[in-house]
Amino acid sequence: TYAGVTSFMRRRYTRDLTGVDLVVSGVPFDTATTNRPGTRFGPRAVRAASITSAWERHWPWEFDPFDLLATVDYGDCDFDHSQPQHTPAAIEAHADRILAAGCAMLTLGGDHFISYPLLKAHAKKHGKLSLVHFDAHSDTWPDTDEGTQGINHGTMFYYAAKQGLVDPSRSVQIGLRTTNDDVMGFQVLDARQVHRSTPEQIA
């Protein structure tokens, strides 16, 4: 189980996207966090954990999802950790290349901020998006200096809404348990509602 290349669910490592439906890639970036770093190790950890399940039957389904979706592991986004100001553009360009090939993306992070450049790339391709966001925090806090569009893991959905990348009226944030003076028009199901509801009611 533990021998060989540690790709996601033992999918083939490649950057040839011919005939590919779904691309798994990592963005090992955590410089935007305001307290605990470490999520840069997330893509590697998820891949390592996934191989223990790669050989099993895909319970409870009676089908193998990889028979329906041609899936590859694209590796990680390339960027320079010493120049975080250039990282958003690098992540966006990484996503642009994958989306231009007609593939869907499953991205392993990384702190929450990586959602912003990924949303920018997807909005360019598909237009204004609807967002389903599971979190304890809304991540719609305004940047203290909007002129800089600072890299922060609590501002990305503020910019996503303000720049028209997502439609807040058709988006929902689930599980919030912190206050925010401005939720930017997102529909919110807070933690109390979630705890008192069934998954079917939430859906």
Describe these PLM feature segments.
Residues 1-203:
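Conserved alpha-helical scaffold segments that buttress catalytic/binding sites
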